[in-house]
Amino acid sequence: MINKKLKSKSVLITAGAQGIGAAITKHFIDSGANVIIHYFSSEKAANELKNYAIEKGQKAIALKADLTKESQVNLLIEKAIEAFGGINILINNVGSLIARNSLDKMEENFWKKVMDVNLTSMMLVTRAATPFLVQNKNSSIVNLASLAGRKGGHAGSLAYATSKGAVLTFTRALSTELGEKGVRVNAVAPGLILGTAFHNTHTTKASAQKTIDGIPIQRAGNANDVARAVVYLASEYDGFITGATLDINGGVYNM
């Protein structure tokens, strides 16, 4: 999907070099945007996407950071502003199940780690980027939530589902707070998205097939399904949509 209204806009995508994040980054590049590609461990993929954008005549940088560390977040934003002069769009894509743990096996450190990766990092990046987002007209934020945040997730995803439910609330609350400053805030909640490290690591083939059998359109999603929705919400042509969550799950959850 090519969105000409994104041409020359500056977009920061966290975890923008693998899985859903890589698809999001590529869709923004193909729409003419300049991209700030954050990564933690996917340096090679990040640089490949950076070079892809540069070859198309656009600006791009790849920056490494641990987004659970405030100092590294602040440095990331500082480098982005130095390179691009501003940020128009923020995509908060960082997130992980980390491991499956039920309540009776839940350790405090594990719980805190999941919350730090999925929620605290989002707050830190958004807080650091917002002073620059508000300087540009029609800026927007898109947060990556999950169907697990809607329904509670599969067995062992208590901490993950809780954190993603909090992302939904964070999105609604922040849309109210930043609306008067001209920044829209929305989220997407993907369901089963195969071909990603998340499901390759944490979902068995049998579990995936069982889930697919319950999806009305009878297929799993893919990273491009999510990327198209993110680009839509981030763009200027839907300027009256804020505080919303777009469910991408083939009809499993349709409220």
Task: Give the predicted meaning of each segment.
Residues I2, L97, V231, T242-M255:
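Short C-terminal tail/terminal secondary-structure segment
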Residues N101-L103, E107-M115, H199, T211:
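Substrate-binding pocket helix/loop in short-chain dehydrogenase/reductase
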